[in-house]
Amino acid sequence: MDIEERINLVLKKPTEEVLTVENLRHLFEVGAPLQHYIGFEISGYIHLGTGLMAGAKIADFQKAGIKTRIFLADWHSWINDKLGGDLEVIQEVALKYFKVGMEKSIEVMGGDPKKVEFVLASEILENGDYWQTVIDISKNVTLSRVMRSITIMGRQMGESIDFAKLIYPMMQVADIFYQGVTIAHAGMDQRKAHVIAIEVAQKLKYHPIVHNGEKLKPVAVHHHLLLGLQEPPVWPITSEEQFKEIKAQMKMSKSKPYSAVFIHDSPEEIKQKLRKAFCPAREVNYNPVLDWAEHIIFREEPTEFTIHRPAKFGGDVTYTTFEELKKDFAEGKLHPLDLKNAVAEYLIELLKPIREYFERHPEPLELMRSVKITR
Ligand SMILES: Nc1ncnc2c1ncn2[C@@H]1O[C@H](COP(=O)(O)OP(=O)(O)OP(=O)(O)O)[C@@H](O)[C@H]1O
Ligand SMILES: N[C@@H](Cc1ccc(O)cc1)C(=O)O
């Protein structure tokens, strides 16, 4: 596969941003080690945003010949008060639920879970050099910048937080350097950590990634944040500014009821959540159901997506590109209920192997039911 094809795989949907494509091309050209990583807090059930969006990109990275790694951020979850802030519970959930849930998600998106390395944060934290890296980074970042970056842990600026939470962003940057990551991957909400990493890499006393004597910059790949199904806090949205702000806040999240479909949800739950979803007729700018169609169903184009309707409502219709579907919806030729039902059916089929796995192996979900999901 040539370099342009490999770059196109990295750029493929749901990628929203690559910092920068030139540096990525350079990594390929000089034959640098291609070490990817994506980190997750261990906080609750895996939803379509965390499982399928990350899983899809992991599949693409593997096809592009990049080594893939999932970083199970147990210490970070403890700092961020997840699962009652109990490190032992967090580690148990990481190894017995989260790992297998991500493996299954990667598989349904066409990747090979056996080629993904899973690393628990506490394994690398034990090494003394890790903390030296954290301090080195901290000496190159201002306090106000650290405070602005707490959004990477789902916290808001101005929120009252304990001091440990200010160490977290520096740890996330250290995780990149310490693991020799050349391709740091996450959803768009994590970009602040990666921008710090790219800048600070140039300022440290030692350089974190050296290849054949050359100091390389890490590359950041950010995927689209899948919208949650809930209604936005204000409607209609009247300005571009307001639109951007709302979109950033309205990502699918397990903490918002009816926002998320979980990877193990039953067909009935999926149908019910979609039936209640925010999906006004003709609305194509802010529409979570269309957002899911674009980033999950039409990730590959052309693809055949058939919407079944009774003859009196126009009969079956098949779309091969997202643009065709969007156009019909905008013109009122496709009813929200028909779109919702078809997206629900697609997801039920896509998630079937995961559901069946958890039916055969109920222990991970039993464990999840026994833990306290906080925040
Ligand atoms: N809706 C989403 N769409 C795509 N990626 C997501 C989404 N939500 C989270 N991610 C990504 O998954 C990774 C883990 O994020 P995080 O732990 O915040 O997810 P979460 O389970 O949705 O958390 P929370 O429900 O507390 O917001 C990050 O890279 C993040 O950008
Ligand atoms: N901040 C990430 C989790 C994370 C933690 C450490 C990392 O090195 C990377 C990612 C989130 O909230 O989803």
From Swiss-Prot:
Catalytic activity: tRNA(Tyr) + L-tyrosine + ATP = L-tyrosyl-tRNA(Tyr) + AMP + diphosphate + H(+)
InterPro entries the UniProt entry points to: aa-tRNA-synth_Ic (IPR002305), Rossmann-like_a/b/a_fold (IPR014729), Tyr-tRNA-ligase (IPR002307), Tyr-tRNA-ligase_4 (IPR023678), Tyr-tRNA-ligase_arc/euk-type (IPR023617), Tyr-tRNA_synthase (IPR050489)
Leading EC class: ligase
Residues that, per the record, bind L-tyrosine: Y37, Y168, Q172, D175, Q190
Gene Ontology MF annotations: ATP binding; tyrosine-tRNA ligase activity
Cell compartment(s), UniProt: Cytoplasm
GO biological process, one term: tyrosyl-tRNA aminoacylation
EC number from the UniProt entry: 6.1.1.1
Broad class of where this protein is predominantly found: cytoplasm
Cited function: Catalyzes the attachment of tyrosine to tRNA(Tyr) in a two-step reaction: tyrosine is first activated by ATP to form Tyr-AMP and then transferred to the acceptor end of tRNA(Tyr).
Record family assignment: Belongs to the class-I aminoacyl-tRNA synthetase family. TyrS type 4 subfamily.
Assembly mode: Homodimer.
Protein name: Tyrosine--tRNA ligase
Biological source species: Pyrococcus abyssi (strain GE5 / Orsay)
